[in-house]
């Protein structure tokens, strides 16, 4: 067990869009430390978004993240030999973390051929409140609503 909690490191804003959120997306999409490939995937996806929507890609991306962010999640709590799924509020930092995780996971599951197209389409869908990642948020909220009776077990 740690003596102290590890300090959160601050990420640097990305060079093109000057956004920490884009840097976090790059870090999340990166595999085996290949940052260059991850950056090209994100930036190419943003170019596709610009072509398809004629809007600023960073605005579409931010709107998508806002639409995916969960406000409640379930945590399992063991009480008296029974496991309860207790709905808890999600901190702002964790909302962004979950939104990015879901966005990238559901982009990877799409049927298009190339990751840039998959990611661009998932971001566009999420900004329009459709797509797998938005469905995941809605399912999470539904489960939290269904288990509202156990909310008094919060800690």
Curated annotation (Swiss-Prot):
The keyword Heme does not apply. InterPro entries: Ribosomal_uS7 (IPR000235), Ribosomal_uS7_bac/org-type (IPR005717), Ribosomal_uS7_CS (IPR020606), Ribosomal_uS7_dom (IPR023798), Ribosomal_uS7_dom_sf (IPR036823). CDD domains: uS7_Bacteria. PROSITE patterns: RIBOSOMAL_S7. GO terms for biological process: translation. The keyword Transmembrane does not apply. GO terms for molecular function: rRNA binding; structural constituent of ribosome; tRNA binding. GO terms for cellular component: small ribosomal subunit. Keywords: Ribonucleoprotein, Ribosomal protein, RNA-binding, rRNA-binding, tRNA-binding. PANTHER family: RIBOSOMAL PROTEIN S7. Belongs to the universal ribosomal protein uS7 family. Part of the 30S ribosomal subunit. Contacts proteins S9 and S11. One of the primary rRNA binding proteins, it binds directly to 16S rRNA where it nucleates assembly of the head domain of the 30S subunit. Is located at the subunit interface close to the decoding center, probably blocks exit of the E-site tRNA. This is Small ribosomal subunit protein uS7. The lineage of its organism: Bacteria, Bacillati, Mycoplasmatota, Mollicutes, Mycoplasmataceae.
